[in-house]
Curated annotation (Swiss-Prot):
The gene is rpsJ. Disulfide bonds: none annotated. Keywords: Ribonucleoprotein, Ribosomal protein. Part of the 30S ribosomal subunit. One of its GO terms (molecular function) is tRNA binding. The keyword Ribosomal protein applies. One of its GO terms (biological process) is translation. It comes from the Bacteria. InterPro entries: Ribosomal_uS10, Ribosomal_uS10_dom, Ribosomal_uS10_dom_sf. Belongs to the universal ribosomal protein uS10 family. This is Small ribosomal subunit protein uS10. It comes from Chlorobaculum tepidum (strain ATCC 49652 / DSM 12025 / NBRC 103806 / TLS). Pfam families: Ribosomal_S10 (PF00338).
């Protein structure tokens, strides 16, 4: 039985539509190379909440909360070819999307 190679691509962004759009573009590129692909798998969304005082001096009870969510998607590519890797390297992702690649 042959050992399968895997590439895992994790996409992170504060805008869920941007993550979904670029996940589909990556999938389209990989499908052209006939590699096996799983995804996009939505990972749990993390919400970060920051609480700050409204006033710099008094009124400790008067506070304001700011929240933002980070959305993540996972794409797994099985048995990638050299052409698959070349096409993935040529993709130019926008600055709002963070990409993490593990093999």
């Amino acid at each position: 039985m042959a050992v399968q190679q895997k590439i895992r691509i994790k996409l992170k962004s504060y805008d869920h539509s941007l993550v979904d759009k670029w996940a589909l573009k990556i999938i389209d590129v990989v499908k052209q190379t006939e590699a096996i692909i799983f995804g996009p798998i939505p990972l749990p969304t993390k919400t970060h909440v920051y609480t700050v005082n409204r006033s710099p001096h008094v009124d400790k009870k008067s506070r304001e909360q700011f929240a933002f969510s980070s959305h993540k998607r996972l794409i797994e590519i099985i048995n990638p070819t050299a052409r698959t890797i070349d096409m993935l390297m040529k993709l130019e992702l926008p600055s709002g999307v963070d990409v993490e690649i593990k093999s």
